[in-house]
Amino acid sequence: MRPMASKEAQLEALLYAAGDDGLETDNLLQLLEISPSALRELANHLKDRLKNDENSGLQLICINHTYKLTTSAECGDVISKFFQKDLSKNLSQSALEILSIIAYRQPITRVEIDDLRGVNSSGALQTLVWRGLIKVNGKKDVPGHPNLYVTTDYFLQYFNYESLADLPVIEEFEADDNPVNLFDQDEQNSKEINFDEGE
């Protein structure tokens, strides 16, 4: 039987899974079943471990009682280079799928996106933020106060739309199972994606 992961390992895993939204203190206390002082001790130890590990490109931050794992400042240049060097490069299938969901359902939280897709969207969501195609626009008034994501003006520019009204109407695709092609494949090298509007 596999031994139980340490509380610090659990904290690290939770913050990784939470992605860009991070996790508020109260949520972590409930999930880890520890006291506030124990959480502070765990967080400080994890923060120091990541900071002192020259082979780690991550850091732990806490803003407004919300803990997040982010890339370290030392890796800032290469991260910026990765996300910004070639915006004409094809977006991944998952990124396009997330982008379509946000375009039609905005404002929307990461958890709501995950529920629609059935998988974790943190990585692709962060890529879209870095590329300037989506942004955080406030927080939802529910427990945990998750970030709300919307598309940006650059999203319209990038995909050659004048407004969101130019997006294909979902009803046009409900009569069959054809994939929804949200973006101009010839000009933007985008892919066809299946988009389930849900109920």
From Swiss-Prot:
The entry's keywords: Cell cycle, Cell division, Chromosome partition, Cytoplasm
GO biological process: cell division; chromosome separation; DNA replication
InterPro entries (UniProt xref): ScpB_csome_segregation, WH-like_DNA-bd_sf, WH_DNA-bd_sf
Transmembrane segments: none
Classification via Gene3D superfamilies: Winged helix-like DNA-binding domain superfamily/Winged helix DNA-binding domain
GO cellular-component term (any): cytoplasm
Localization per record: Cytoplasm
Source organism superkingdom: Bacteria
Coiled coil: none
Function as written in the Swiss-Prot or TrEMBL entry: Participates in chromosomal partition during cell division. May act via the formation of a condensin-like complex containing Smc and ScpA that pull DNA away from mid-cell into both cell halves.
Subunit structure: Homodimer. Homodimerization may be required to stabilize the binding of ScpA to the Smc head domains. Component of a cohesin-like complex composed of ScpA, ScpB and the Smc homodimer, in which ScpA and ScpB bind to the head domain of Smc. The presence of the three proteins is required for the association of the complex with DNA.
PANTHER family xrefs: SEGREGATION AND CONDENSATION PROTEIN B
Family to which this protein belongs: Belongs to the ScpB family.
Name by which UniProt lists this protein: Segregation and condensation protein B
Annotated source species: Lactobacillus gasseri (strain ATCC 33323 / DSM 20243 / BCRC 14619 / CIP 102991 / JCM 1131 / KCTC 3163 / NCIMB 11718 / NCTC 13722 / AM63)
Lineage: Bacteria, Bacillati, Bacillota, Bacilli, Lactobacillales
Gene: scpB
